[in-house]
């Protein structure tokens, strides 16, 4: 149930506007729904392409996009003078939300962001039932799109909150626009550049590799003060995990703590010499790739068979979550600790219910990606819209201001010097020998 513009590939940047997401009730009719919202049947059908099919039948539980009437422009469409954070006034319990992302079906970026956007829509529908209303404005920003026409749209400056962009070169003009008009800008995915360090209106969700390495090293030093670290050189010239292993070794040396280094090609005897017989050994690989993990597990099996009393734990990488169906038994066996910024639990009732609703709304399953893009959009929209609705311009996304329990992606922001807010939420997933998973939040 996406607007037709999502599939249009010939236009660089487009905007879609609607006043509601309506769930069809038992005795509803197309005419009755259109009449209720003071729009024409044609406008309703244009916003919901499935309704234009010859065999279409209105069904209970179906979700319909309700557009604004073309004959009666909504207030958000009226040109307004530039506003600042100090002067911006927001209608009570209504948040104007902008989405500036590639929303198309041309490539993987567009498909992933479309799913993310669908999650935002589902969050807005959920919030409406709790008395928090939203007006959503979405712009389809291709990779090479000029953002100027989008920022010139009168609807853009009326937003309280904008999600996007995806591409680095679009960040600065959009961020400058948001600072000028007192708008919160949420950058949801990976970008290069340090705009968050200078622009106090940016919320940067993505954590750089260097920042993630620092958080991981902090967690390791906090949890394994009395352990014996064992670094395994996996001979992977393509690995970028040296950012973490170098940082951790510096921390250990500064604290006067010893560690061992071994090699994946070492003989079983030489490999065993790197391990302590009296302390817990924490194994750290310098790659996140599956083949090297597999080889390491095989060597640990030989070690454990030879020395059954040796205590072993693994300290891994976020990529390991992608391999869990293959290695999960080993994660439990060797007490794996996996750093992550999200926790996807398909068996959690709330997650399963949302995935079921997604299937009903959009006639497809979520992409098999980690993290799930729709859940990411849902969590981020819930977090920010709730926060802005409660705290207004004072919302900073700190742990003290959090009003939402996430399904997958926790958020906790901290200000970057005199700049914006950086997400510093960090989780260790601890796979325990009793086959339970402990979630350790920092």
Model region roles, listed by residue range:
Residues 8-10:
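N-terminal signal peptide c-region/cleavage motif recognized by signal peptidases
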Residues 1-3:
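Sec-dependent signal peptide recognition
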Residues 14-442:
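Extracytosolic ligand-binding ectodomains
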């Amino acid at each position: 149930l996406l607007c037709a513009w999502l599939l249009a590939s010939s236009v660089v940047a487009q905007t879609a506007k609607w006043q509601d997401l309506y769930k069809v009730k038992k005795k509803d009719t197309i005419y009755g729904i259109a009449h209720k919202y003071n729009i024409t049947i044609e406008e309703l059908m244009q916003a919901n392409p499935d309704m234009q099919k010859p065999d279409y039948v209105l069904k209970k539980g179906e979700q319909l996009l309700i557009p604004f009437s073309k004959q009666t422009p909504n207030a958000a469409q009226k040109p307004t003078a530039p506003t600042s954070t100090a002067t911006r006034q927001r209608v009570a319990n209504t948040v104007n939300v902008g989405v500036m992302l590639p929303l198309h079906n041309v490539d993987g970026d567009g498909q992933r962001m479309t799913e993310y956007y669908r999650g935002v829509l589902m969050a807005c529908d959920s919030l409406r039932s709790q008395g928090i209303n939203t007006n959503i404005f979405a712009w389809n920003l291709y990779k090479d799109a000029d953002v100027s026409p989008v920022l010139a749209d009168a609807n853009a400056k009326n937003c309280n909150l904008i999600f996007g962009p995806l591409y680095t070169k679009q960040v600065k003009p959009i961020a400058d626009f948001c600072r000028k008009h007192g708008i919160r800008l949420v950058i949801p995915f990976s970008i290069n550049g340090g705009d968050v360090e200078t622009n106090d209106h940016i919320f940067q969700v993505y954590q750089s590799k260097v920042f993630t390495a620092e958080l991981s090293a902090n967690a390791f030093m906090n949890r394994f003060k009395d352990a014996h670290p064992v670094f395994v050189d996996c001979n992977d010239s393509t690995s970028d995990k040296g950012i973490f292993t170098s940082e951790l070794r510096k921390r250990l040396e500064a604290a006067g703590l010893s560690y061992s280094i071994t090699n994946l090609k070492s003989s079983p005897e030489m490999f065993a010499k790197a391990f302590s017989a009296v302390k817990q050994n924490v194994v750290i690989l310098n790659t996140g790739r599956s083949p090297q993990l597999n080889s390491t597990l095989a060597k640990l099996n030989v070690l454990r068979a030879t020395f059954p009393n040796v205590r072993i734990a693994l300290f891994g990488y976020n990529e390991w979550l992608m391999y869990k169906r293959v290695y999960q038994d080993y994660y439990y066996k060797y007490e794996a600790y996996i750093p992550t910024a999200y926790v996807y639990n398909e068996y959690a009732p709330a997650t399963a219910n949302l995935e079921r609703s997604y299937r009903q709304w959009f006639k497809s399953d979520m992409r098999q990606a980690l993290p799930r893009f729709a859940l990411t959009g849902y969590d981020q929209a819930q977090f920010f819209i709730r926060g802005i609705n409660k705290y207004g311009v004072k919302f900073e996304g700190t742990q003290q201001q959090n009003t939402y329990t996430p399904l997958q992606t926790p958020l906790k922001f901290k200000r970057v010097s005199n700049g914006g807010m950086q997400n510093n939420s960090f989780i260790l997933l601890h796979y325990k020998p009793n086959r339970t998973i402990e979630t350790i939040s920092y």
